């Protein structure tokens, strides 16, 4: 395999295909002399998230998303970039690979960074995913020959599928016959590169001659309702294996969401389908794989390919159009065995396959269909035909067999219980139904009845429900029988005075429910305390008599619940009967010695549960009533005190250690906070000031103020320390609100940048003086700014209409349309090729002479700076500029002095990563242009030098005025981000060939030779007199 440039591997799911390339990648990464960068591509975003977790887990490889490479280029650290097929087919990716050597040399100034392996997982999708084949067309443009090796992996790619898939992406396909390695090395095709040589196939399934997936128990069931049957199976699994996980594959995205909505009350679910965004799919997949409390992953078939999930014990497929590949991939998720259920609705399995797709699986033996797909010998009608299917358990592991048996026993038990429920009276079925519902929905805060001297279905002579026992003075609850004595709850004991429910203890005058405490005249429910008089359950109050909240059906003599029996001294629950010594539950009756539960009755020696009645010797549960000798349960304040305690809630920006600030302390602050939230309502999202002004999203994309941060502000403007970072106020006066993502200070400096967009240097300097009262008050400045909101919006639309036309609508700039340019500059009469040659010549001279780039383009000063050209990365480059004082000179000579001292320096960080990506992509295009013209490829500047050039040109007053005069389609821009965007648009040269505007800028700059520029004429501030025609 190591001697073959392109290989395809088919191995069964769970075989360990990841390790086939994981170990070689680690070996490549360990080489010290050369840095290898490899790429892995998978079909779906869900699988991408799983691969990132698995490959980065060991720490041997530096793994990153391939989107980082597409947007920013190679970072020199990452060993493996992981992406999806759409990334592999993108033009940006293929361009970066085509220009790899040039980009590497410009970025790292070394040839020791090389392309390693190209790995494509589940590559059968190139052929079987019919609806996506149009998206794969861009892969044919990829330069496969640039890679050290190409590896194609799949668990479901027989020779015919593999050959067609490889040809579809532009490769030769599989080798038609096996070839000796010496013959391979002598092959002329190999000298032409990887793409021209056939791919060698390693079929590990045929070599083993074993049918895959025999370790999984596969069950095909036809049911009336797929969702109901699936829910039963899942509940049974989690009852047997509470820590296990399961996957459910649905047919449609709507079904996925419906199942997730209806099942989330039973267990924690994660759902995924193709309509979710890529980031959301990655986040949800990661959550399911890493969060042990997540039980079920529901999704369409994209959740079945390549995902490796620990504790996965069941896969359920509800898709009626499942083909053999999807079945194998789904079953293959059960790495260590488990259960796979194929649930289909009765009389609905027949389905036609769409053109070009594989047909759905047939009803019958699953193993035999798997053999047919892989080209293995059929065993139909022979011994060993069924492997893990059709009831055969021979090849299953002991754990899987045990799981099947436990599932069967549970199913039998549930079936027996169902038959018993059918035979019981309707009232009992009702009770069980409500109990099941209560498991998920009920709360323990409310009680239905109160008792005197007893607790929870336990009295001196009481009645317990659902039993057959006979006692002395009570009536059966929830039955229609009339008895002389009483009945014990779910026991067969007969007692004289009372019976303990759910315990084995017998007491003299009371019963402790679920406790072991003995009391004199009261009962503690769910506590172990011993009291003299009584203690309220779930409260801390002590009362004289006693009341048990969260109990039911307790009386002095007896209680009749949900029955029609008539007794002498009993209680009718859910009836309107009036008794002498009893308690009415859910009625309006008035009694002498009883307790009203959930009623408005007034009693003498009783307890009101969930009422507002006032009693003499009682405890109110979950109420705010005031009592004489009681305590309110579940209340936030003492009923016998007048104080109103208030929560101490601090705003997130408040330093709690320094300030004991309470929100009630300043009503003025709360009011101001509320007003600001209403005035700037979208600060909870990623809002920017252009949205606040009313610009559309497509306009914001090109006017957006990237690179604008606190360093844009001059010293002393919105930069005070020791205050709230969000609003620059003292902590006790902070007006930020919880959940605010975009601070008022950030909006203020963006608003300041908008004002800079509309003013030249002198006007902006005066503006900074005008807003001096707001230098320490960004909130006040925002209010001042918002007053002119409509006027500012209109002014930007007028002043930047030309800019939006060029950058957003991509209107063409032609030098031939500029009359002044044709008359006043030789550059405007040059061809595109001449402009490019001049550009490369300028950079060649700068490289040879080691000239300081920024200083040269600022004022044609050819000062030497060898450190700048020898710097190996961006940080060293910036340090070299700072060491020779470039940034200080720039601030003293130009409008850069109107920003913070670190502003220009920080432009070399990550502010302009999108622009950097576009520039590095253009290197590949320029390289191809040079090769097409027959010109010897010239070295082009790396990104940091290129950015230095544009900053120098931006701050060069003479050059700016000359360019704006000659090129009539552009006007002035006063923000560096806008200048950088403008420099990258394309211009039609005199011969109608396209060149980047920055190349035209360098040609104009070269034309303005230093001898033509008067010495010492650079103003400190960059100011343009629009009435003066420069250059005439």
UniProtKB/Swiss-Prot annotation:
GO terms for cellular component: cytoplasm. SUPFAM superfamilies: P-loop containing nucleoside triphosphate hydrolases. PANTHER family: FANCONI ANEMIA GROUP M PROTEIN, HELICASE WITH DEATH DOMAIN-RELATED. Pfam families: DEAD (PF00270), Helicase_C (PF00271). It comes from Saccharomyces cerevisiae (strain ATCC 204508 / S288c). Residues 635-658 have a biased composition (Basic and acidic residues). InterPro entries: DEAD/DEAH_box_helicase_dom, Helicase_C-like, P-loop_NTPase, RLR_Helicase. Residues 455-634 have a biased composition (Low complexity). Gene3D superfamilies: P-loop containing nucleotide triphosphate hydrolases. This is Y' element ATP-dependent helicase YPR204W. Keywords: ATP-binding, Helicase, Hydrolase, Isomerase, Nucleotide-binding. The keyword Nucleotide-binding applies. A motif (DEAH box) lies at residues 121-124. Induction: Induced in absence of telomerase TLC1. GO terms for molecular function: ATP binding; ATP hydrolysis activity; DNA helicase activity; nucleic acid binding. Catalyzes DNA unwinding and is involved in telomerase-independent telomere maintenance. Residues 1-175 form the Helicase ATP-binding domain. Its EC number is 5.6.2.-. Belongs to the helicase family. Yeast subtelomeric Y' repeat subfamily. ATP binds at residues 11-18. Residues 232-381 form the Helicase C-terminal domain.
């Amino acid at each position: 395999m190591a001697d073959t440039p392109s290989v395809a591997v088919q191995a069964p799911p769970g075989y360990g295909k990841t390790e086939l390339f994981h170990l070689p990648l680690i070996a490549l990464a360990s080489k010290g002399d050369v840095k290898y960068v490899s790429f892995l591509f998978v079909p779906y975003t869900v699988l991408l998230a799983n691969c990132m977790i698995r490959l980065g887990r060991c720490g041997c490889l530096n793994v990153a998303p391939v989107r980082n490479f597409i947007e920013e280029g190679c970072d020199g650290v990452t060993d493996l970039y992981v992406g999806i097929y759409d990334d592999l087919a993108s033009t940006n990716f293929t361009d970066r690979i085509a220009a790899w050597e040039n980009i590497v040399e410009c970025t790292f100034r070394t040839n020791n960074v090389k392309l390693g392996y190209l790995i494509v997982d589940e590559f059968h999708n190139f052929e079987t995913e019919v609806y996506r084949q149009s998206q794969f067309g861009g892969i044919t443009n990829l330069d496969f020959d640039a890679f050290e090796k190409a590896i194609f992996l799949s668990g479901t790619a027989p020779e015919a599928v593999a050959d067609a898939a490889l040809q579809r992406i532009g490769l030769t396909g599989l080798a038609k016959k096996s070839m000796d390695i010496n013959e391979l090395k002598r092959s002329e095709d190999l000298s032409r590169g990887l793409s021209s040589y056939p791919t060698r196939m390693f079929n590990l399934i045929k070599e083993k001659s074993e049918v895959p997936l025999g370790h999984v128990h596969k069950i095909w069931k036809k049911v009336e309702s797929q969702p109901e049957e699936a829910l039963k199976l899942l509940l049974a699994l989690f009852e047997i294996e509470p820590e296990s996980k399961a996957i459910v594959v649905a047919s449609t995205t709507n079904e996925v969401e419906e199942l997730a909505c209806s099942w989330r009350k039973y267990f924690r679910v994660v759902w995924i389908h193709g309509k979710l965004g890529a980031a959301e799919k990655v986040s949800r997949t990661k959550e399911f794989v890493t969060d042990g409390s997540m039980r079920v992953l529901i999704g369409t078939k994209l959740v079945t390919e390549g995902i490796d999930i620990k504790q996965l014990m069941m896969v359920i497929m509800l898709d009626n159009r499942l083909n053999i590949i999807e079945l194998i991939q789904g079953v293959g998720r059960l790495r260590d065995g488990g259960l796979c259920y194929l649930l289909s609705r009765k009389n609905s399995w027949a389905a036609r396959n769409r053109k070009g797709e594989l047909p759905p699986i047939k009803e019958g033996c699953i193993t035999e269909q798997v053999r047919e797909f892989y080209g293995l010998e059929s065993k139909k009608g022979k011994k060993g035909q069924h492997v893990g299917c059709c009831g055969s358990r021979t090849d299953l592991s002991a754990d899987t067999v045990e799981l099947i048996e436990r599932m069967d026993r549970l199913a039998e038990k549930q079936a027996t219980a169902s038959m018993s429920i059918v035979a019981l009276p309707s009232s009992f079925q009702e009770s069980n139904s409500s109990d099941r519902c209560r498991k998920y929905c009920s709360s323990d805060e409310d009680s239905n009845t109160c008792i005197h001297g007893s607790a929870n279905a336990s009295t001196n002579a009481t009645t317990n429900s659902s039993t057959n026992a006979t006692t002395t003075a009570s009536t059966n609850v929830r039955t229609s029988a009339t008895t002389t004595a009483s009945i014990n709850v779910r026991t067969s004991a007969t007692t004289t005075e009372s019976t303990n429910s759910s315990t084995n203890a017998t007491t003299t005058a009371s019963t402790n429910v679920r406790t072991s405490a003995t009391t004199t005249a009261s009962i503690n429910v769910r506590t172990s305390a011993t009291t003299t008089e009584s203690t309220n359950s779930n409260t801390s109050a002590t009362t004289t008599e006693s009341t048990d909240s969260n109990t039911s059906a307790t009386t002095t003599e007896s209680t009749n619940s949900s029955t029609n029996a008539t007794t002498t001294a009993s209680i009718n629950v859910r009836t309107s009967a009036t008794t002498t010594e009893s308690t009415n539950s859910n009625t309006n009756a008035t009694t002498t010695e009883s307790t009203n539960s959930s009623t408005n009755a007034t009693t003498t020696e009783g307890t009101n549960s969930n009422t507002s009645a006032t009693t003499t010797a009682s405890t109110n549960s979950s109420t705010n009533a005031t009592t004489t000798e009681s305590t309110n349960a579940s209340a936030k304040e003492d009923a016998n005190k007048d104080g109103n305690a208030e929560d101490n809630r601090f705003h997130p920006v408040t330093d709690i250690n320094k300030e004991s600030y309470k929100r009630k302390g300043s009503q003025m602050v709360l009011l101001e906070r509320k007003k600001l939230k209403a005035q700037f309502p979208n600060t909870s999202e990623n809002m920017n000031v252009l949205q606040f002004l009313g610009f559309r999203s497509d306009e914001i994309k090109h006017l957006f103020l990237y690179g604008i941060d606190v360093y844009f502000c001059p010293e002393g403007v919105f930069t005070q320390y020791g205050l709230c970072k969000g609003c620059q106020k003292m902590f006790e006066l902070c007006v930020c609100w919880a959940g605010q993502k975009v601070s008022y200070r950030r909006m203020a400096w963006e608003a300041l940048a908008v004002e800079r967009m509309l003013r030249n240097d002198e006007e902006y300097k005066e503006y900074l003086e005008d807003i001096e009262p707001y230098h320490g008050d960004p909130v006040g400045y925002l209010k001042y700014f918002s007053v002119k909101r409509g006027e500012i919006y209109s002014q930007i639309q007028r002043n930047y209409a030309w800019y939006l036309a060029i950058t957003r609508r991509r209107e063409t700039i032609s030098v031939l349309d500029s009359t002044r340019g044709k008359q006043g500059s030789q550059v405007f009469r040059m061809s595109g090729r001449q402009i490019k040659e001049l550009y490369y010549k300028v950079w060649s001279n700068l490289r040879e002479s080691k000239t300081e780039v920024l200083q040269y383009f600022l004022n044609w000063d050819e000062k030497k700076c060898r450190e700048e050209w020898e710097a190996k990365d961006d940080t060293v480059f910036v340090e070299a500029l700072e060491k020779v004082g470039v940034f200080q000179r720039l601030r003293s000579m130009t409008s850069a002095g109107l920003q913070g001292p670190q502003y220009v320096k920080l432009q070399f960080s990550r502010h302009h990563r999108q622009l950097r990506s576009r520039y590095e992509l253009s290197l590949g295009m320029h390289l191809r242009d040079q090769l097409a013209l027959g010109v010897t490829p010239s070295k082009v500047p790396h990104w940091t030098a290129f950015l230095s050039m544009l900053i120098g040109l931006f701050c060069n007053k003479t050059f700016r005025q000359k360019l704006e005069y000659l090129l009539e389609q552009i006007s002035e821009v006063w923000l560096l981000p806008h200048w950088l965007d403008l420099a990258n648009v394309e211009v039609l040269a005199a011969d109608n060939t396209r060149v980047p505007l920055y190349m035209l800028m360098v040609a104009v700059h070269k034309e303005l030779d230093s001898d033509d520029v008067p010495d010492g004429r650079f103003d400190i501030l960059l100011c343009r007199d629009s009435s003066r025609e420069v250059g005439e």
